[in-house]
Amino acid sequence: MVAAVRYRALFGIPLLLAVAAVLWSFLASSGPIQWMDNGTFIADASEGRYFSDTLGPLDHPLYLFVTTALFAHFGPLVLSFMNSMLLIPLGWAIFRLAKGIGATSQQALLAIAAAVLCHCVFWVSTKAEVYLLHTLLVTLAYMVHFRDKSRLGLLTALFVIGILTGLAAAIHQLTFIVLFPLYVQLVWQHRARVLLTIPGFVLGFAVAIPGVLQEMQNGLSLIDIGHRYLIGIPDNPTEQSWQGSLFRFDDMWHEKNSVGLLMLSLLGPQLVALVLFPRSRRLRLLWCAAVLNFIFAVSYNVTDRFTFFLPGAVLLSIIGVIHVQAWLARRKAAVVAYALPFSGPVTILAVYAVYASGAVSLPTHKEALPFRDDIHYFMAPYLRDRSAETFVHSYEQSAPQGALIVADWTPNGALRSAQASGLLKGRTIALCEGAQDIESYLNGPGAFLARTSYCSSISDRFDLQTLAVGYELRAK
């Protein structure tokens, strides 16, 4: 009897916490209509185009292939839950990786819950976004490195690590930063045998090869293609480039709000892991990868820089839980470890509750969106946000079939994903910079502008009639 109770305490409770964390993500999902990139990913998947015909800095060939297949077979609703579903294999990879570096089963299960409930991981899990699949592949690569060597030989392991690296690289360039410490150790330990990762990489990266071939037909060399994929072409004014945003430590104070959003992912055992240099060599490897990821993400000059921190947050969750749980166990307070995964969410939700009561004000995006509370949307992903869906339903009422709806990038994602879900039938959706023949709509079904932000080229040309949401365009 005593043994059974002890087993439930050591294994059952942490397992329940991990399962509850994953289920919470399903409940908090933003659904098949989403803002900005997230909605655009759903819309792109609906087009039935499995392979990217370019390989630029914003292309994610493997993610496009997977989401297109998922949309074709199961539709937009299941696709909107894809990242929540990916938490299940990610949890398994975290458990195996944690065990591989010496964690107990209890610590490994607590690490799953801590990682899933970490702000950046949970936020991405509720959206259509590339970073969770990427994080799964990176975590699997480290898991294979710390494998049970009696079950998987060295040469096979190197080949598998190469495949996982290629798959991850076919999603995002962050792969080369997060896996850099792993490859340094592989070269140090195995010398020339590391070359076995190359055929694996080529195999994993195969889904991006159609884009490479198309770029070569357009006149780019392999060196130019690689440079463009990694950081863009900064000399090309029409090309979106990473180069001007990388390692912008000089601009962090000016962008302190987005830096603060990233710091929310350190509320809990992750902060302990970041500031304490591990004694264990195995933990040091994960720590180095997480620190490199943190340095990149915190200095990457974009609003949603926190989404680039998922691999580091997962690795820090494992290290932090091991550190803190062991420290608590030595002080006969091991039961407190069960609260570790919830330290971040509880803190965030408490601050949000104070904000929602009106007691304090928090900085919001200077360009507000209809129906969206930015503090709720960005800071509190644990509470479901369906503002994009509400926004779209308003246009179902105000914009008749045949109308033109012009919007900047953020609401455009919501409008396009709505069409992928069967809403806004017969309406034409256009970006502000790409809208054409607007005048032809004025005397017919009408032309509508979602908001004036980032659309001065449109708002300056027409009279704007204010509606409940957005504007109707009229000739001057």
Q: Which residues does each PLM region occupy?
A:
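Hydrophobic, aromatic-rich transmembrane alpha-helices
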Residues: 3, 258-281
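Signature aromatic-anchored transmembrane alpha helix within multi-pass, membrane-resident enzymes
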Residues: 15, 202, 279, 323-363
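Short acidic/glycine- and proline-prone juxtamembrane loop motifs at membrane-interface regions
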Residues: 36, 123-131
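Loop-to-helix entry region of an early transmembrane alpha helix in multi-pass inner-membrane enzymes
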Residues: 57, 61, 65, 73-92, ...
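Transmembrane-helix motifs of polytopic, lipid-linked glycan transferases
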Residues: 81-102, 140-144, 272-273, 319-322
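Hydrophobic/aromatic-rich transmembrane helices and adjacent perimembrane loops
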Residues: 132-133, 177, 295-329
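Perimembrane helix-loop-helix junctions
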Residues: 147-151, 176-203, 277, 425
